[in-house]
């Protein structure tokens, strides 16, 4: 429903983790990303949690998926992991750690792919020790 009423939004963070089967968390809200200067869509249901991305960050690592007949723009696996570290104060460090662990151990993305998006999100210093531990 969100994708139909707001086709420009990108599903991210906990919603993207759930779509990629990378978390045990069940988000109570739909997490969406919008550009810095965009207005968030107004919807009474489902509840939306909006985060703002820079133009470069919003364009990087977005893929289109077909879910229940709707075309969704979703952040890819390595981009979602980097975003979780960027917004770790919102999603929690535990969620970010679970995401990077499941991604690397499950071979859903390589360390280099995650690192590329960490550079886009400017979280290399935060993410480096965790990636080194998993290497």
Question: Model-predicted segments: where are they?
Answer:
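Nucleic-acid-binding surface
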Residues: 1-135
């Amino acid at each position: 429903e969100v994708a139909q009423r707001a086709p420009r939004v990108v599903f991210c963070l906990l919603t993207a983790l759930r779509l990629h089967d990378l978390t045990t968390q069940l988000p109570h809200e739909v997490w969406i990303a919008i550009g810095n200067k965009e207005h968030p869509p107004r919807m009474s249901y489902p509840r939306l949690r909006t985060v703002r991305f820079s133009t470069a960050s919003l364009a990087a690592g977005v893929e289109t998926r077909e879910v229940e007949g709707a075309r969704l723009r979703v952040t890819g696996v390595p981009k979602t992991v980097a975003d979780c570290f960027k917004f770790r104060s919102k999603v929690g460090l535990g969620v970010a750690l679970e995401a990077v662990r499941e991604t690397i151990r499950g071979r859903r993305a390589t360390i280099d792919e995650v690192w590329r998006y960490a550079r886009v999100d400017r979280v290399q210093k935060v993410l480096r020790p965790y990636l080194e531990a998993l290497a």
